[in-house]
Amino acid sequence: PINDSARNFAKNIYGNATPKLITISRLDGRKSHQNIIMTVKNLLPKFPNLKYVSIGDGDERRNLEKLIIEFELEKNVELIFKSTEQEKVSLLEQSDVFVMPSVVYKKSVEGFGIAYIEAASYGKPSVGGIYGGEGDAIKSGKTGYLCNGNDLNAIYENLVKILSDEKYKQLGANALEFSKDFSWDKIIKN
């Protein structure tokens, strides 16, 4: 169970924001954080109370901090470089959508995508990229959507599709059910 301190941490980060987007990963060019941040800017007219939280640190940290300032997104985007496991889980639990539309970066692609399965285990739909292993972790149209992580319009459209339609709750329920296929018990049996 999540402790009160972690729950309060997440409530303080999100405040009254809605919708709440989250990414949990290294700040790496392959993870497409910069494109998510640019998409957040484009989503604000439709979702003015949106909050995007990214948990993790890495080589792209300075570039992302500059981008947030350049786009005046300090109130809408929060980069959390260190967190406890409880805080991370509480933020994920309180979020609406996991977003990490990864791209090919330095000839490297996303592997299996365990982060999407973790999000699914909390009933969160995901938006992921088309180039790596995300297709094994996200069933497009059922547990979230896959899109070209270099295409800001595709990221935008998929997030709007999830956030504007009550059906997104069904995507989360489907994701939760799908995540059970990745339990150790199931993996051992297969």
Task: Enumerate the predicted regions with their spans.
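C-terminal alpha-helical cap of glycosyltransferases
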Residues: 184-190
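Short acidic alpha-helix that forms the nucleotide-activated donor recognition element
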Residues: 62, 84-95, 121, 139
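A short, well-ordered alpha-helix in the C-terminal region of glycosyltransferases
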Residues: 44, 154, 167-181
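Conserved acidic donor-binding segment of nucleotide-sugar-dependent glycosyltransferases
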Residues: 139-141, 145-152, 161-166
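Nucleotide-activated donor-binding/catalytic signature segment of Leloir-type glycosyltransferases, i.e.
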Residues: 62-86, 97
